[in-house]
A protein has these predicted regions:
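Glycine-rich beta-alpha junction loops
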Residues: 87-91, 137-139
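Short, basic, glycine/proline-bearing loop/turn elements
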Residues: 53-57, 97-109
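C-terminal catalytic or substrate-handling cores of phosphate/nucleotide-
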Residues: 190-224
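Generic secondary-structure signature for well-ordered alpha-helical cores
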Residues: 63, 69-81, 122-130, 167-176, ...
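Extended, well-ordered protein cores
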Residues: 17, 22-56, 63-70, 76-78, ...
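Single conserved hydrophobic/aromatic residue that forms the stacking wall/gate
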Residues: 1-5, 9
Length: 224
């Protein structure tokens, strides 16, 4: 009987957190948000059967932060039980893998493995409940470094602080790196992030050389 009651509460908690996430996601902002909103809307109807039936939901740094804060507030108010948040390695900053996750970095640094390690260490320093750093993952041993985390939402104000400090860090590590590699969309995202956190946090941005000017200088130099 107790197991059945637990299953009811677990299912109710899933439904409540589904609705809470939907309230935070703006489906009209961009197609990806609309897709994520529809996915979480239909998650209960699709009757997931793997493991705990936990949801995989992709959001940007601030979307993840806001959803985590909402969940933690729901735990604090007794609306749901404690929640474990985590993420997989198909993410911006958690994995160095030149054959997959970092294959779109074209400045030559895609073969270095410092990003996942920095992400791992930063998550530890910011108070994540669980952190992991390991070799391999999808592309094979020696071809990737993966880092992950788990964060228990217990309803405490301390966890609110950890969310505010660690969730944006975990995501923006990878956006920052692609920004430094001159990825146009990452540069736009970092510029928006810096504007949002002006006075409290900032990510350095690359100085983009003028291709026409460089070509002109080389032509003039080689013509002499």
């Amino acid at each position: 009987a107790s197991r059945g009651l637990g299953d009811v509460y677990k299912r109710q908690d899933l439904v409540k957190t589904d609705h809470a996430a939907m309230d935070i996601i703006d489906p009209n902002r961009r197609f990806q948000d609309r897709d994520n909103w529809v996915w979480i809307r239909d998650a209960e109807k699709n009757k997931l059967v793997v493991g705990t039936q936990c949801r995989i939901l992709y959001q940007d740094a601030l979307g993840r932060r806001d959803i985590a804060l909402k969940f933690n507030d729901m735990v604090r108010k007794g609306e749901i039980g404690p929640v474990m948040l985590g993420r997989d390695h198909h993410d911006t900053g958690g994995t160095d893998s030149p054959y997959r996750e970092t294959s779109n970095i074209y400045d030559g640094s895609n073969f270095t493995a410092d990003m996942a390690t920095h992400c791992f260490a930063g998550n530890a320093a910011r108070g994540m409940s669980l952190i992991a750093l390991h070799n391999g993952g999808g592309t094979g041993i020696g071809k990737a470094i993966n880092g992950g985390f788990g964060l228990v939402l217990d309803g405490s104000e301390l966890t609110d602080q950890i969310i505010r400090e660690s969730i944006p860090w975990d995501t923006m590590v990878g956006v920052s790196r692609r920004n430094w590699a001159r990825n146009e969309h990452s540069i736009e995202t970092v510029a928006e992030y810096n504007k949002t956190f002006e006075g409290s946090d900032a990510i350095t941005m690359p100085y983009i050389a003028d291709d026409a000017l460089i070509e002109k200088v080389f032509k003039e130099a080689t013509a002499k």
